[in-house]
Protein backbone atom coordinates (compact mmCIF):
# COMPACT_ATOMS: atom_id res chain seq x y z
CA UNK A 1 0.00 0.00 0.00
CA UNK A 2 2.89 2.39 0.73
CA UNK A 3 4.22 1.94 -2.80
CA UNK A 4 0.76 2.65 -4.20
CA UNK A 5 0.50 5.85 -2.16
CA UNK A 6 3.86 7.13 -3.40
CA UNK A 7 2.93 6.38 -7.01
CA UNK A 8 -0.35 8.27 -6.73
CA UNK A 9 1.37 11.27 -5.15
CA UNK A 10 3.90 11.41 -7.98
CA UNK A 11 1.09 11.19 -10.52
CA UNK A 12 -0.66 14.15 -8.92
CA UNK A 13 2.55 16.20 -9.17
CA UNK A 14 2.71 15.39 -12.87
CA UNK A 15 -0.60 17.14 -13.52
CA UNK A 16 0.72 20.49 -12.29
CA UNK A 17 1.98 23.21 -14.54
CA UNK A 18 4.54 27.26 -12.25
CA UNK A 19 4.07 29.69 -6.90
CA UNK A 20 2.46 27.78 -4.19
CA UNK A 21 -0.69 25.98 -3.13
CA UNK A 22 -0.58 27.03 0.50
CA UNK A 23 -3.20 29.54 1.66
CA UNK A 24 -2.25 33.09 2.51
CA UNK A 25 -0.43 33.67 5.78
CA UNK A 26 -2.51 33.82 8.97
CA UNK A 27 -5.65 32.36 7.43
CA UNK A 28 -7.93 29.42 8.26
CA UNK A 29 -9.22 26.52 6.21
CA UNK A 30 -11.48 23.49 6.61
CA UNK A 31 -12.12 20.34 4.64
CA UNK A 32 -12.90 16.66 4.46
CA UNK A 33 -11.36 13.48 3.10
CA UNK A 34 -12.37 9.99 2.00
CA UNK A 35 -10.20 7.02 1.19
CA UNK A 36 -8.89 3.52 1.64
CA UNK A 37 -8.15 2.50 5.22
CA UNK A 38 -6.06 -0.60 5.82
CA UNK A 39 -5.29 -2.24 9.15
CA UNK A 40 -1.89 -3.94 9.31
CA UNK A 41 -0.03 -6.10 11.81
CA UNK A 42 -3.20 -6.55 13.83
CA UNK A 43 -1.54 -8.54 16.57
CA UNK A 44 -4.87 -10.23 17.26
CA UNK A 45 -4.99 -12.68 20.17
CA UNK A 46 -8.05 -14.36 18.72
CA UNK A 47 -7.54 -17.61 16.87
CA UNK A 48 -9.75 -16.73 13.94
CA UNK A 49 -10.83 -19.54 11.68
CA UNK A 50 -12.05 -17.19 8.92
CA UNK A 51 -11.00 -14.12 6.92
CA UNK A 52 -10.18 -10.76 8.51
CA UNK A 53 -11.30 -7.84 6.34
CA UNK A 54 -8.49 -5.35 6.85
CA UNK A 55 -9.35 -3.05 3.93
CA UNK A 56 -12.13 -0.63 4.79
CA UNK A 57 -13.55 2.79 3.96
CA UNK A 58 -11.95 5.62 5.92
CA UNK A 59 -13.05 9.23 6.21
CA UNK A 60 -12.30 12.39 8.10
CA UNK A 61 -12.72 16.11 8.53
CA UNK A 62 -10.13 18.70 9.44
CA UNK A 63 -9.72 22.34 10.38
CA UNK A 64 -6.43 24.18 9.92
CA UNK A 65 -4.50 27.39 10.46
CA UNK A 66 -1.88 28.49 7.91
CA UNK A 67 0.83 30.45 9.74
CA UNK A 68 2.95 31.06 6.65
CA UNK A 69 3.81 29.54 3.29
CA UNK A 70 5.64 26.63 4.88
CA UNK A 71 3.96 25.98 8.23
CA UNK A 72 0.40 25.19 9.24
CA UNK A 73 -1.42 23.38 12.04
CA UNK A 74 -4.34 20.97 11.69
CA UNK A 75 -6.88 19.36 13.97
CA UNK A 76 -9.22 16.74 12.63
CA UNK A 77 -11.43 13.74 13.16
CA UNK A 78 -10.61 10.37 11.54
CA UNK A 79 -12.82 7.36 11.10
CA UNK A 80 -10.45 4.51 10.37
CA UNK A 81 -13.12 1.93 9.58
CA UNK A 82 -14.63 -1.24 11.01
CA UNK A 83 -12.51 -4.38 10.57
CA UNK A 84 -14.65 -7.55 10.81
CA UNK A 85 -13.31 -11.07 11.17
CA UNK A 86 -15.60 -13.93 10.23
CA UNK A 87 -15.26 -17.57 11.03
CA UNK A 88 -17.39 -20.58 11.86
CA UNK A 89 -16.27 -20.60 15.49
CA UNK A 90 -15.05 -17.08 16.22
CA UNK A 91 -16.25 -13.84 14.65
CA UNK A 92 -16.41 -10.19 15.61
CA UNK A 93 -15.23 -6.71 14.65
CA UNK A 94 -12.68 -4.07 15.57
CA UNK A 95 -13.19 -0.38 14.84
CA UNK A 96 -11.13 2.73 15.52
CA UNK A 97 -11.61 6.45 15.36
CA UNK A 98 -9.86 9.47 16.82
CA UNK A 99 -9.00 13.13 16.97
CA UNK A 100 -5.67 14.15 15.52
CA UNK A 101 -3.45 17.18 15.98
CA UNK A 102 -0.49 17.76 13.66
CA UNK A 103 1.91 20.33 12.28
CA UNK A 104 1.83 20.60 8.49
CA UNK A 105 5.11 21.39 6.72
CA UNK A 106 4.67 22.40 3.07
CA UNK A 107 7.00 23.15 0.20
CA UNK A 108 5.97 24.62 -3.20
CA UNK A 109 7.15 22.61 -6.21
CA UNK A 110 5.14 24.13 -9.07
CA UNK A 111 2.37 26.57 -9.88
CA UNK A 112 -0.32 26.09 -7.23
CA UNK A 113 1.17 22.76 -6.14
CA UNK A 114 2.76 21.90 -2.78
CA UNK A 115 4.10 18.73 -1.30
CA UNK A 116 3.75 18.39 2.45
CA UNK A 117 4.17 16.22 5.50
CA UNK A 118 2.09 16.20 8.66
CA UNK A 119 3.63 15.20 11.97
CA UNK A 120 1.63 14.79 15.14
CA UNK A 121 -0.48 12.40 17.11
CA UNK A 122 -3.89 10.70 17.16
CA UNK A 123 -5.98 10.42 20.30
CA UNK A 124 -7.87 7.27 19.41
CA UNK A 125 -10.69 5.11 20.69
CA UNK A 126 -10.80 1.45 19.75
CA UNK A 127 -13.89 -0.75 20.19
CA UNK A 128 -14.16 -4.51 19.74
CA UNK A 129 -16.80 -7.15 20.18
CA UNK A 130 -16.87 -10.83 19.35
CA UNK A 131 -18.63 -14.15 19.52
CA UNK A 132 -16.51 -17.17 20.42
CA UNK A 133 -16.85 -20.96 20.62
CA UNK A 134 -19.72 -20.98 18.18
CA UNK A 135 -21.64 -18.29 20.00
CA UNK A 136 -21.33 -19.77 23.48
CA UNK A 137 -19.16 -16.88 24.64
CA UNK A 138 -19.53 -13.20 23.84
CA UNK A 139 -17.26 -10.29 24.79
CA UNK A 140 -16.80 -6.58 24.06
CA UNK A 141 -14.47 -3.83 25.16
CA UNK A 142 -12.94 -0.50 24.31
CA UNK A 143 -9.68 1.27 24.83
CA UNK A 144 -8.28 4.79 24.39
CA UNK A 145 -4.78 6.08 23.88
CA UNK A 146 -2.41 8.25 21.88
CA UNK A 147 -0.31 7.13 18.93
CA UNK A 148 2.16 8.95 16.67
CA UNK A 149 0.89 10.06 13.27
CA UNK A 150 2.84 10.72 10.08
CA UNK A 151 1.42 11.77 6.70
CA UNK A 152 2.85 12.58 3.27
CA UNK A 153 0.87 14.28 0.54
CA UNK A 154 0.49 16.73 -2.30
CA UNK A 155 -1.98 19.61 -2.48
CA UNK A 156 -3.19 21.47 -5.56
CA UNK A 157 -5.08 24.77 -5.44
CA UNK A 158 -7.48 24.99 -8.36
CA UNK A 159 -8.88 28.34 -7.22
CA UNK A 160 -7.86 30.84 -4.55
CA UNK A 161 -10.35 29.30 -2.12
CA UNK A 162 -10.57 25.65 -3.11
CA UNK A 163 -7.84 23.01 -3.02
CA UNK A 164 -7.63 19.26 -3.29
CA UNK A 165 -5.11 16.97 -1.65
CA UNK A 166 -3.97 13.38 -1.80
CA UNK A 167 -2.10 11.91 1.15
CA UNK A 168 -1.03 8.75 2.87
CA UNK A 169 -1.35 8.74 6.66
CA UNK A 170 0.21 6.22 9.03
CA UNK A 171 -0.79 5.64 12.67
CA UNK A 172 1.07 3.13 14.80
CA UNK A 173 -0.34 0.78 17.46
CA UNK A 174 -4.03 1.45 17.94
CA UNK A 175 -5.64 -0.36 20.87
CA UNK A 176 -4.46 -2.74 23.56
CA UNK A 177 -4.41 -6.49 22.92
CA UNK A 178 -5.55 -7.37 26.42
CA UNK A 179 -8.50 -4.97 26.27
CA UNK A 180 -9.80 -5.11 22.70
CA UNK A 181 -7.97 -8.17 21.44
CA UNK A 182 -5.84 -6.42 18.81
CA UNK A 183 -3.21 -3.72 18.39
CA UNK A 184 -3.07 -2.89 14.68
CA UNK A 185 -1.32 -0.17 12.73
CA UNK A 186 -3.39 1.80 10.21
CA UNK A 187 -2.60 3.31 6.84
CA UNK A 188 -5.11 5.69 5.25
CA UNK A 189 -4.77 6.70 1.59
CA UNK A 190 -7.25 9.50 1.00
CA UNK A 191 -8.34 12.26 -1.31
CA UNK A 192 -9.54 15.47 0.32
CA UNK A 193 -11.03 18.84 -0.52
CA UNK A 194 -10.51 22.01 1.51
CA UNK A 195 -11.98 25.50 1.51
CA UNK A 196 -9.74 28.41 2.47
CA UNK A 197 -11.02 31.52 4.16
CA UNK A 198 -9.66 35.03 3.60
CA UNK A 199 -7.99 34.44 0.24
CA UNK A 200 -9.48 37.47 -1.51
CA UNK A 201 -6.97 40.05 -2.65
CA UNK A 202 -7.07 43.29 -0.70
CA UNK A 203 -8.54 46.16 -2.66
CA UNK A 204 -5.87 48.42 -4.05
CA UNK A 205 -5.76 51.72 -2.19
CA UNK A 206 -7.26 54.62 -4.07
CA UNK A 207 -4.48 57.07 -4.71
CA UNK A 208 -5.64 60.63 -5.13
CA UNK A 209 -4.24 62.21 -8.27
CA UNK A 210 -1.36 64.54 -7.64
CA UNK A 211 -2.63 68.08 -8.00
CA UNK A 212 -1.13 70.02 -10.86
CA UNK A 213 1.58 72.35 -9.62
CA UNK A 214 0.70 76.01 -9.51
CA UNK A 215 1.95 78.03 -12.47
CA UNK A 216 5.15 79.96 -11.92
CA UNK A 217 4.77 83.73 -12.05
CA UNK A 218 7.41 85.22 -14.32
CA UNK A 219 7.90 88.94 -13.62
CA UNK A 220 9.97 91.26 -15.79
CA UNK A 221 10.47 95.02 -15.56
CA UNK A 222 11.39 97.29 -18.45
CA UNK A 223 12.48 100.92 -18.13
CA UNK A 224 12.12 103.38 -21.01
CA UNK A 225 13.43 106.94 -20.95
CA UNK A 226 10.68 109.51 -21.33
CA UNK A 227 13.03 111.64 -23.47
CA UNK A 228 12.93 108.83 -26.05
CA UNK A 229 9.17 108.39 -25.87
CA UNK A 230 8.02 111.98 -25.47
CA UNK A 231 9.04 115.54 -26.04
CA UNK A 232 9.88 117.61 -22.97
CA UNK A 233 6.77 118.26 -20.91
CA UNK A 234 4.69 116.36 -23.51
CA UNK A 235 2.55 113.18 -23.35
CA UNK A 236 2.24 112.34 -27.06
CA UNK A 237 4.42 109.50 -28.30
CA UNK A 238 7.18 110.46 -30.72
CA UNK A 239 7.87 108.21 -33.73
CA UNK A 240 11.06 107.09 -32.01
CA UNK A 241 8.95 106.26 -28.95
CA UNK A 242 6.58 104.13 -31.00
CA UNK A 243 9.53 102.22 -32.44
CA UNK A 244 10.86 101.63 -28.95
CA UNK A 245 7.45 100.29 -27.85
CA UNK A 246 7.28 98.05 -30.94
CA UNK A 247 10.56 96.45 -29.89
CA UNK A 248 9.28 96.13 -26.34
CA UNK A 249 6.06 94.46 -27.48
CA UNK A 250 8.07 91.78 -29.28
CA UNK A 251 9.71 90.94 -25.95
CA UNK A 252 6.36 90.97 -24.14
CA UNK A 253 5.00 88.34 -26.52
CA UNK A 254 7.48 85.77 -25.16
CA UNK A 255 6.07 86.28 -21.67
CA UNK A 256 2.49 86.05 -22.98
CA UNK A 257 0.91 88.92 -21.06
CA UNK A 258 -2.51 87.71 -22.22
CA UNK A 259 -2.28 85.17 -19.41
CA UNK A 260 -0.82 87.67 -16.96
CA UNK A 261 -0.90 91.39 -16.34
CA UNK A 262 0.95 94.57 -17.38
CA UNK A 263 1.38 97.66 -15.22
CA UNK A 264 2.63 100.90 -16.83
CA UNK A 265 4.15 103.40 -14.36
CA UNK A 266 4.91 106.97 -15.38
CA UNK A 267 7.53 109.05 -13.49
CA UNK A 268 8.52 112.74 -13.63
CA UNK A 269 11.54 114.67 -12.39
CA UNK A 270 11.47 117.20 -9.55
CA UNK A 271 11.48 120.28 -11.74
CA UNK A 272 8.18 122.11 -11.34
CA UNK A 273 5.26 121.56 -8.99
CA UNK A 274 4.32 118.05 -7.78
CA UNK A 275 0.68 118.21 -8.94
CA UNK A 276 1.37 119.06 -12.58
CA UNK A 277 4.20 116.51 -12.64
CA UNK A 278 1.85 113.82 -11.29
CA UNK A 279 -0.72 114.63 -13.96
CA UNK A 280 1.95 114.55 -16.68
CA UNK A 281 3.26 111.18 -15.51
CA UNK A 282 -0.31 109.79 -15.59
CA UNK A 283 -0.90 111.03 -19.15
CA UNK A 284 2.38 109.51 -20.32
CA UNK A 285 1.51 106.17 -18.69
CA UNK A 286 -1.90 106.30 -20.39
CA UNK A 287 -0.26 106.93 -23.77
CA UNK A 288 2.00 103.92 -23.42
CA UNK A 289 -0.91 101.76 -22.25
CA UNK A 290 -3.10 102.79 -25.19
CA UNK A 291 -0.34 102.05 -27.67
CA UNK A 292 0.29 98.56 -26.27
CA UNK A 293 -3.44 97.84 -26.34
CA UNK A 294 -3.45 98.82 -30.01
CA UNK A 295 -0.68 96.26 -30.58
CA UNK A 296 -2.76 93.44 -29.12
CA UNK A 297 -2.50 93.39 -25.33
CA UNK A 298 -6.05 92.98 -23.89
CA UNK A 299 -7.25 96.20 -22.29
CA UNK A 300 -8.41 94.33 -19.18
CA UNK A 301 -4.89 93.02 -18.63
CA UNK A 302 -3.05 96.33 -18.61
CA UNK A 303 -3.25 99.29 -16.21
CA UNK A 304 -1.54 102.69 -16.14
CA UNK A 305 -0.58 104.70 -13.09
CA UNK A 306 1.26 108.00 -12.71
CA UNK A 307 3.79 108.22 -9.88
CA UNK A 308 4.85 111.86 -10.34
CA UNK A 309 8.15 112.74 -8.62
CA UNK A 310 8.17 109.56 -6.52
CA UNK A 311 11.11 107.15 -6.48
CA UNK A 312 13.78 109.25 -8.24
CA UNK A 313 16.73 107.23 -9.45
CA UNK A 314 19.22 110.15 -9.43
CA UNK A 315 19.09 110.62 -5.67
CA UNK A 316 21.09 113.77 -4.70
CA UNK A 317 23.55 113.63 -7.57
CA UNK A 318 21.94 116.63 -9.28
CA UNK A 319 21.51 118.87 -6.22
CA UNK A 320 24.26 121.33 -7.16
CA UNK A 321 23.87 121.20 -10.94
CA UNK A 322 23.30 124.54 -12.69
CA UNK A 323 22.12 126.12 -14.98
CA UNK A 324 18.58 124.80 -15.67
CA UNK A 325 19.46 123.15 -18.97
CA UNK A 326 22.19 121.15 -17.26
CA UNK A 327 19.81 120.24 -14.44
CA UNK A 328 17.18 119.04 -16.94
CA UNK A 329 19.79 116.82 -18.56
CA UNK A 330 21.03 115.52 -15.19
CA UNK A 331 17.50 114.60 -14.09
CA UNK A 332 16.69 112.77 -17.36
CA UNK A 333 16.83 109.28 -15.71
CA UNK A 334 14.00 110.33 -13.37
CA UNK A 335 11.78 111.06 -16.36
CA UNK A 336 10.93 107.51 -17.32
CA UNK A 337 8.25 104.94 -17.92
CA UNK A 338 8.53 101.56 -16.22
CA UNK A 339 6.58 98.58 -17.51
CA UNK A 340 6.13 95.62 -15.18
CA UNK A 341 4.95 92.40 -16.85
CA UNK A 342 3.72 89.34 -14.96
CA UNK A 343 3.25 86.18 -17.02
CA UNK A 344 2.43 82.61 -15.99
CA UNK A 345 4.41 79.55 -16.97
CA UNK A 346 2.92 76.09 -16.60
CA UNK A 347 5.06 73.59 -14.69
CA UNK A 348 5.38 70.32 -16.58
CA UNK A 349 5.93 67.33 -14.32
CA UNK A 350 7.35 64.05 -15.54
CA UNK A 351 4.99 61.09 -15.07
CA UNK A 352 6.17 58.59 -12.49
CA UNK A 353 7.34 55.26 -13.73
Swiss-Prot record:
Q: Region (4 X 2 AA approximate tandem repeats of A-P): which ranges?
A: 208-215
Might you name a Gene Ontology BP term for this protein? monoatomic ion transmembrane transport
Q: Note whether Transport occurs among the keywords.
A: yes
Naturally occurring in which organism (per UniProt) = Yersinia pseudotuberculosis serotype I (strain IP32953)
Q: What is its main location?
A: membrane
Q: What is this protein called?
A: Outer membrane protein A
Oligomer and partners: Monomer and homodimer.
Q: Does the keyword Transmembrane apply?
A: yes
Annotated keywords:
Cell outer membrane, Disulfide bond, Ion transport, Membrane, Porin, Repeat, Signal, Transmembrane, Transmembrane beta strand, Transport
Q: Which family does it belong to?
A: Belongs to the outer membrane OOP (TC 1.B.6) superfamily. OmpA family.
Q: Where is this site: Part of salt bridge gating mechanism?
A: 74, 165
Matches recorded under Pfam families: OmpA, OmpA_membrane
What does the record give as the function of this protein? With TolR probably plays a role in maintaining the position of the peptidoglycan cell wall in the periplasm. Acts as a porin with low permeability that allows slow penetration of small solutes; an internal gate slows down solute passage.
The cellular component terms of Gene Ontology attached to this UniProt record, alphabetical and capped at eight, are: cell outer membrane; pore complex
The OmpA-like domain is annotated at 217-345
Checking InterPro entries in the record gives:
Bact_OuterMem_StrucFunc (IPR050330), OMP/PagP_b-brl (IPR011250), OMP_bac (IPR006664), OmpA (IPR002368), OmpA-like (IPR006665), OMPA-like_CS (IPR006690), OmpA-like_sf (IPR036737), OmpA-like_TM_dom (IPR000498)
Provide any one GO MF term from the record.
Answer: porin activity
**Compartmental location:** Cell outer membrane
Could you tell me the membrane topology recorded for this protein? Answer: Multi-pass membrane protein
Amino acid sequence: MKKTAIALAVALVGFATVAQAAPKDNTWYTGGKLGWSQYQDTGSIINNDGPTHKDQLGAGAFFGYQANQYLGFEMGYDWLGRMPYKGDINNGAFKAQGVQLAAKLSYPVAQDLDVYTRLGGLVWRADAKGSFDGGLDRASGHDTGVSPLVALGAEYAWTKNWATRMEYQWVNNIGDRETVGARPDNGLLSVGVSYRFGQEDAAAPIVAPTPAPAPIVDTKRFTLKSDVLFGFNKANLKPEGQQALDQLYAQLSSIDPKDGSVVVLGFADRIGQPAPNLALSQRRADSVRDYLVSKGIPADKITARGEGQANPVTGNTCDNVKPRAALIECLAPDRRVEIEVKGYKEVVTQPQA
